[in-house]
Amino acid sequence: MSRRRISCKDLGHADCQGWLYKKKEKGTFLSNKWKKFWVVLKGSSLYWYSNQMAEKADGFVNLSDFTVERASECKKKNAFKINHPQIKAFYFAAENLQEMNVWLNKLGFAVTHQESITKDEECYSESEQEDPEVAVEAPPPPYASTTSSPVAAQWASSSSPKRRETSCSFSSLENTVKAPSQFSSSGSKERQSWHNIVNSSPATEDAGLPLTFAEQVHTLAFSEASNCQAPENNCITSEGGLLNLLSSDDTSSLNNNKDHLTVPDRAAGSRMADREEIKSSEDDEMEKLYKSLEQASLSPLGDRRPSTKKELRKSFVKRCKNPSINEKLHKIRTLNSTLKCKEHDLAMINQLLDDPKLTARKYREWKVMNTLLIQDIYQQQAPQDPEVTPQEVMNPTSSDCVENSL
């Protein structure tokens, strides 16, 4: 079993722990090449988790036979590497120089004070794809017939001597059945041995062997035992009793196998969910990039994209958290509105003055229609001409109208 299957809580008191950036193995062009992990040093083992409450480590390294040094080839500041000349190098980076020095001291102490690992011990484990997946297949009903399948025969020819010894032990045990009085004792021993083998199937799974492989061992062993029994035993009653015994044991063994096969289904489902989360995170990065370009009013090529009326309306309604900036923005918006109104008034006046067929009647009609504009014009002239009273501003004389018309 992988040593990564240990939660951050189960590690207990650590020699050193903290947040570090780890360089990805295959960094894409748009995504970030460094990812933040919670790194824990425990003895000669270095674990990194996605968060402090993670139930399983994202990676594990046994620091024996590794070297720790600063990574001057990396562009990122405060980076260091854990290197092995024959395996691979792991790159980490700290937030500041002080944290990097602490990690270098702790890791250097862990490397120098540990013995080299044995061949059977796991050196490092990093990603979900590196874990051996358990093959889950529905086993065929064993002992349905005395003849074995071609796949089983091929496996039997290439099996190890230990597997052959187990099959011979089963055949020798069956050959001892010669009398009805001895049949019950040998049957009970056979039940115990068969149940022990079935119950030990999870151990083979932990060692890295698939369940179907262990089940083929049992089927082949008993098929060879039944084939060896036919020429040696001449007693028909004992042979029939043995078949009944095996058929009764089949039901219990199949039930036990079903119980053991339910666990890998959950593991396979969790792996599929993890892969889907990785794909969704990659898609989210592209989505974030597109949204950031859209907020900056930029095209995918980096060109300035013209704002639409809807975006302008949203920007007018949107408020800023800073009150001073909000006041300035409001003043700019009001000035823009005033400018539009003045431009409209100027267009109305130009339309009147540019008319070559302008008469007194047309002027009166225009004056009635644009009363507010006339009042605004006289109000602007009032500070420049102090002799004009407010009544004259509100009620202009006929002479003024004539002068304006001329």
From Swiss-Prot:
**Alphabetical list of InterPro entries matching this protein:** CNKSR, PH-like_dom_sf, PH_domain
User: Looking at the keywords, is Disulfide bond present?
Assistant: no
Q: What CDD domains does the record point to?
A: PH_CNK_mammalian-like
Going by the UniProt record, its keywords in alphabetical order are:
Cell membrane, Cytoplasm, Membrane, Phosphoprotein
Q: Where are the residues of the annotated region Disordered?
A: 120-173, 253-285, 383-406
Q: Name one GO cellular component term.
A: plasma membrane
Q: Where is the composition biased (Acidic residues)?
A: 123-134
Regions of biased composition (Polar residues) lie at 392-406
Function, please?
Answer: Enhances the promotion of guanine-nucleotide exchange by PSCD2 on ARF6 in a concentration-dependent manner.
- What name has this protein been given in UniProt? Interactor protein for cytohesin exchange factors 1
Q: What organism is listed for this UniProt entry?
A: Mus musculus
User: Gene of origin?
Assistant: Ipcef1
